Amino acid sequence: MQLLEERILTDGNILGENILKVDNFLTHQVDYRLMKAIGKVFAQKYAEAGITKVVTIEASGIAPAVYAAEAMDVPMIFAKKHKNITMTEGILTAEVYSFTKQVMSTVSIAGKFLSKEDKVLIIDDFLANGQAAKGLIEIIGQAGAQVVGVGIVIEKSFQDGRRLIEDMGIEVTSLARIKNFENGNLNFLEADA
């Protein structure tokens, strides 16, 4: 997605050898116009897939996921990273390792929001090692629902996340694919949409 790649080049900051900071438009402050455009691209890509739910993980996946859900006219569910006293029955959980925060979290979704009839599109802000998506796939599987695809805003293609998900037989659609970071710059691969 050219608009997204341009925004990454303009407002993204490279930290160290493999971290891209995009807090100016995605991970802290949100550019809703860009998120709306991202949502439309995912909706167009999966228009014929019969998606019934969009699922993400809190927090930075929420903005692109809600706009994708709006464009598809389906509900959006976000997995919670912290225990909630109001979530007491029928909780679906998975352990997820965060590459950025370098911590293990138990993420959860109330089972009443997913059923075996659901066809789910997972949306997330980043794909690095694939652990967040893998955890969501596990939770969705516990409900008996089908994961139709994983939509990613920014993929770090030099890490193993895509291969992990595709080896599970699930399609990955990334709107910006980073080939590498080199001398303080980043290089893109061709995006999926």
Swiss-Prot record:
<protein>
    <recommendedName>
        <fullName>Xanthine phosphoribosyltransferase</fullName>
        <ecNumber>2.4.2.22</ecNumber>
    </recommendedName>
</protein>
<dbReference type="Pfam" id="PF00156">
    <property type="entry name" value="Pribosyltran"/>
</dbReference>
<keyword id="KW-0808">Transferase</keyword>
<keyword id="KW-0660">Purine salvage</keyword>
<comment type="subunit">
    <text>Homodimer.</text>
</comment>
<dbReference type="InterPro" id="IPR050118">
    <property type="entry name" value="Pur/Pyrimidine_PRTase"/>
</dbReference>
<comment type="function">
    <text>Converts the preformed base xanthine, a product of nucleic acid breakdown, to xanthosine 5'-monophosphate (XMP), so it can be reused for RNA or DNA synthesis.</text>
</comment>
<dbReference type="InterPro" id="IPR000836">
    <property type="entry name" value="PRibTrfase_dom"/>
</dbReference>
<comment type="pathway">
    <text>Purine metabolism; XMP biosynthesis via salvage pathway; XMP from xanthine: step 1/1.</text>
</comment>
<dbReference type="GO" id="GO:0000310">
    <property type="term" value="F:xanthine phosphoribosyltransferase activity"/>
</dbReference>
<keyword id="KW-0328">Glycosyltransferase</keyword>
<dbReference type="InterPro" id="IPR029057">
    <property type="entry name" value="PRTase-like"/>
</dbReference>
<dbReference type="GO" id="GO:0046110">
    <property type="term" value="P:xanthine metabolic process"/>
</dbReference>
<dbReference type="GO" id="GO:0032265">
    <property type="term" value="P:XMP salvage"/>
</dbReference>
<dbReference type="GO" id="GO:0006166">
    <property type="term" value="P:purine ribonucleoside salvage"/>
</dbReference>
<keyword id="KW-0963">Cytoplasm</keyword>
<dbReference type="InterPro" id="IPR010079">
    <property type="entry name" value="Xanthine_PRibTrfase"/>
</dbReference>
<feature type="binding site">
    <location>
        <position position="20"/>
    </location>
    <ligand>
        <name>xanthine</name>
    </ligand>
</feature>
<feature type="binding site">
    <location>
        <position position="27"/>
    </location>
    <ligand>
        <name>xanthine</name>
    </ligand>
</feature>
<dbReference type="GO" id="GO:0005737">
    <property type="term" value="C:cytoplasm"/>
</dbReference>
<feature type="binding site">
    <location>
        <position position="156"/>
    </location>
    <ligand>
        <name>xanthine</name>
    </ligand>
</feature>
<feature type="binding site">
    <location>
        <begin position="128"/>
        <end position="132"/>
    </location>
    <ligand>
        <name>5-phospho-alpha-D-ribose 1-diphosphate</name>
    </ligand>
</feature>
<comment type="similarity">
    <text>Belongs to the purine/pyrimidine phosphoribosyltransferase family. Xpt subfamily.</text>
</comment>
